């Protein structure tokens, strides 16, 4: 069987094998797998290996500027107006579902939790954070000290859930499989140790395919997202009463797998700079892939959830009342918040999808500009 094996055209300082603990864990996984590790398993180790992966180690992730030692900024760190606008949709969802619990997956620095708790007040009896990172949990506990009586942390999904769920930039950090078409044949891309000791790629023939046919015969690299779909399906099975809202960057299926998007969407973030090499500086930078929102919607529907809507972050926040908040804000606050809705910043690239357990309703955030028909 033919394999396609090659290096990454990297500079020589990436070539040596580092004898650090994360490298040893990856090498042990490679050995157990026969020398070839599917990318989703590599990505899981790089991001979540206990105490060593990017989201499990002590490095600072979130912040507005690289001078802070951070790697990227998310909307809640940019401005509290994000959380205040989202809170209006959450309040409506709590009322419609008859619940008083709020759940957040991957709470990051705790900024969004603090904003929601402040805005919602007594409408939330309990705020539960599900996060794999012990280091981030410590930071969240510090940020949420004023709300300590309401907040609870969990490291895994409970068997049963009631309430409203929010997840901001959670789905993009779930491991993906890489598939590539070369010479008309499909391969799965995995990670190997090259002869010189560096990490490299090796493509192996596979039965895996993107969810849609990719037109043309040109070489093509993309991702498939079984873990994100499985997460939504499990969430749907366990959400007995409530709703869920996920905010992330991504596209509907037709855009995601467009013939011209032939280089995939995997990106890395460090020091507020982006690169496309997940095999360099492993554990020291974020690895992400855009979200296939059609796959997310179908996973929820197949498991019994109703899709409340799907739209851009800009339209969602404006529907939720961001404009009056901007008018009442200071000039510096308005400048920062403009990034949330500007089409060349977060406004168009980021999307919002909403689900309800049971019967849906005309949700505030999707009142205008709902794009569910594009999924």
Question: Residue ranges of each PLM-predicted region?
Answer:
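A mobile, often basic/glycine-rich helix-loop segment
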Residues: 166-212, 259-269
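Catalytic P-loop NTPase motifs of RecA-like helicase/translocase cores
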Residues: 136, 173-174, 253
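Rossmann-like AdoMet
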Residues: 2-105, 109-156, 161, 179, ...
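Generic recognition of stable, solvent-exposed alpha-helical segments in well-folded globular domains
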Residues: 21, 38-41, 77, 81, ...
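Long, Lys/Arg- and hydrophobic-enriched amphipathic alpha-helices
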Residues: 210-375
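A residue-level signal for conserved active-site and pocket-lining positions in enzyme catalytic cores
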Residues: 46, 165, 296
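Active-site flanking residues adjacent to catalytic metal/cofactor-binding acidic residues
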Residues: 103, 130, 165-168, 247
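A short SAM/SAH-binding and catalytic strip from SAM-dependent methyltransferases
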Residues: 160-180, 225-226, 238, 244
